[in-house]
């Protein structure tokens, strides 16, 4: 009986410590007078006449080869 009361007391103290712990925030230590210079370029070409059936077949093959066995193994491990 004494051991269960001790464990319950320790569990309550542990939970209260977590609940009332101060929030910790990560702050960047940077020079406030630093210059922020950045360049971003994006170049892309889109083909409006893409053959979706060709890509759908490739995606389907990958799903059948890897996805279904993986899903089956996960389902078996859960049950």
UniProtKB/Swiss-Prot annotation:
Family under the similarity heading: Belongs to the formicidae venom precursor-01 superfamily.
Propeptide: 22-48
Record organism: Myrmecia gulosa (Red bulldog ant)
UniProt modified residues of type Glutamine amide: 78
Single GO cellular component term: extracellular region
Keywords carried by this UniProt record: Amidation, Antimicrobial, Secreted, Signal
Major subcellular location class: secreted
Listed name of the protein: U-myrmeciitoxin(01)-Mg9a
Signal peptide as annotated in the record: 1-21
Function (record text): May have antimicrobial properties, like most ant linear peptides.
Lineage top rank: taxon: Eukaryota
Protein localization: Secreted
InterPro entries for the chain: Pilosulin (IPR049518)
Tissue expression notes: Expressed by the venom gland.
């Amino acid at each position: 009986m004494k051991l269960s009361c001790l464990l319950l007391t320790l569990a309550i103290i542990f939970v209260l410590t977590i609940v009332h712990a101060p929030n910790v925030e990560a702050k960047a230590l940077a020079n406030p007078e630093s210059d922020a210079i950045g360049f971003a370029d994006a170049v892309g070409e889109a083909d409006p006449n893409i053959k979706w059936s060709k890509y759908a077949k490739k995606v389907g093959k990958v799903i059948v080869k890897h996805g279904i066995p993986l899903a089956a193994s996960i389902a078996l491990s859960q049950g």
